[in-house]
UniProtKB/Swiss-Prot annotation:
Subcellular location: Secreted
One Pfam family matching this protein: Bradykinin
GO biological process: defense response; negative regulation of blood pressure; positive regulation of smooth muscle contraction
Keywords for the protein's UniProt record, in alphabetical order: Bradykinin receptor impairing toxin, G-protein coupled receptor impairing toxin, Secreted, Toxin
GO CC aspect terms: extracellular space
Top-level taxon of origin: Eukaryota
Coiled-coil regions, chain positions: none
Tissue: Expressed by the venom gland.
Molecular functions (GO terms): hormone activity; toxin activity
Protein name: Cyphokinin
Amino acid sequence: DTRPPGFTPFR
């Protein structure tokens, strides 16, 4: 994954 730390799929 190339997502930043603390990224949440929830809006």
